[in-house]
Curated annotation (Swiss-Prot):
Main function: Antimicrobial activity against Gram-negative bacterium E.coli.
UniProt KW keywords: Amphibian defense peptide, Antibiotic, Antimicrobial, Disulfide bond, Secreted
Disulphide bonds in the chain: C43-C48
Protein name: Palustrin-3b
Compartments where located: Secreted
GO aspect biological process, one term: defense response to Gram-negative bacterium
Tissue expression as described in the entry: Expressed by the skin glands.
Family as reported in the entry's similarity comment: Belongs to the frog skin active peptide (FSAP) family. Brevinin subfamily.
Keyword Disulfide bond assigned: yes
Chief subcellular location: secreted
GO CC field: extracellular region
Native source species: Lithobates palustris
Length: 48
């Protein structure tokens, strides 16, 4: 039937989008952590 196809497609899309957003979220966390590390090591307290 047509409905199982739509449901299956929806589930597939949901999983893919979930993984994408998860990867994006992890990527942003790593990126921000990297930036804060650069900020911390990039200047002495006197210079900040």
């Amino acid at each position: 039937g047509i409905f199982p196809k739509i449901i299956g497609k929806g589930i597939k899309t949901g999983i893919v989008n979930g993984i994408k957003s998860l990867v994006k979220g992890v990527g942003m966390k790593v990126f921000k952590a990297g930036l804060s590390n650069i900020g911390n090591t990039g200047c002495n307290e006197d210079e900040c």
